Amino acid sequence: MTTPVRRRGRTLRQRLLGYITDAVDRLRKAWSILTLAQTRLLNALAGIRPGFSSGTGAKLRAAIAAFNTSLAAFARTVGAWAERWAATDLPLIYREGAWTLLDNADRRQATFTWTQRHQTAITALSAQYYVDLTARIQEALRRARAFLRAAQDASRDAGRGRFDIAELREQHPLDTVVYANQARHPVDAWARAAVTWQAVTTANTAAARTSMDELGISYVEIRDGADCGWRDHRDPDRADRTLRTVQDALAHPVAHAHCQRELLPRMDLIGRTNIMSGAEL
């Protein structure tokens, strides 16, 4: 029906990879403060016999104090990461999404400016994602404190010969995050999925708004994984190499974590209104 757009330069995913990799690396390093603190406390407990004695009490207090110090350091570091990601990185990613679309439309990057509509869009996205991330951080802190309470409770059990270090780690795995379905996932896997979702959503929102506001485009061409659905990965309405209205693209900038979706401008369809959103190329 129409001729597909030929990309000019790097794909959106290639342009975002540096932001995603850097953010995941920084988040991983911040989280390592927490996991190392847990390991140090468990190692300290391994050399302490549960029960009440002056020697045991002093060693336990020192180990707990060290854990609390590390917990505070984790909270500061990961909180600073979330602030930088929301306040600095996401606006840069938004601009990158706009620039990528303009490059593919063979328009100057200076066509994009921080209009009120763009500012409103990035402010809403940044605020939403900051809340999401800080909620995850608060949950990690809650779980860390639960682990500490469990260790303290075990220390009072004089009937124990030794702390069951393996049991404490198994019941309180601080190197994981817990999803809504109660499934535990490694921090690294969660971090990459969350950061990628937020980055691609932000960039594609910018691309869609730039299409509409700066170029007056009604339709964008979708490039995505061959098996990816439009609303979610299993949606039988396939996304790749279809035409979508800009409004539909704003409603579904991504379909799932690690989504490869990219919006390409259809300058040749400006003024057309008779194409059904979802039409195949």
Segments predicted by a language model, with ranges:
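N-terminal leader/targeting and assembly helices and adjacent pre-domain segments
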Residues: 1-178, 274-281
